[in-house]
Amino acid sequence: MDHNARFVAQTVVAFVMILPIFAQPSPRSHALDEDGALALLEQTLKHDGVYAHRISLNCVTYGTEETTGAYFQFVLRENHNAKCGGDPETSPVVDRYRVYRKSGKIEWLERVEDNWQPYNPAKIR
């Protein structure tokens, strides 16, 4: 690989590595509906691997707990069935999230302090 190609490859790799540090949810031209908010949440959790070492995302279900003019609040629950295991009569809460309609900002309910925190995958894992 010649010097210029190596430099370009290193620059691209460096850009890809630091982009998530500066990436913030962009203001949306239109507000999210419930399906869009849930899709954003699922995509974000999957991309960040928040539950990769805790539970398969195939073994969770999402439910809408609250809808306001500002946000949708979702609950993430364990899915107990033959494939995922567990008592099928229960579906314990894993976490709760709010997705804001206009900004796409995500918040997570920190259960010990019982307050809403900005989404930070490192704190949730």
Whereabouts are the PLM-identified features?
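Eukaryotic scaffold repeat domains enriched in small/polar residues
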Residues: 45-50, 67-68, 72, 76, ...
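Short, non-transmembrane alpha-helical segments in secretory-pathway proteins
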Residues: 26-61
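C-terminal partner/receptor-binding element of secreted or periplasmic proteins
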Residues: 105-125
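Short, solvent-exposed loop/turn elements at domain surfaces
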Residues: 49-50, 82-86, 107-108
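Bacterial N-terminal signal peptides that target proteins for export
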Residues: 2-12
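Bacterial N-terminal signal peptides
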Residues: 10-20
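Exposed beta-strand-loop-beta-strand "reactive/processing" segments of non-cytosolic proteins
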Residues: 56-100
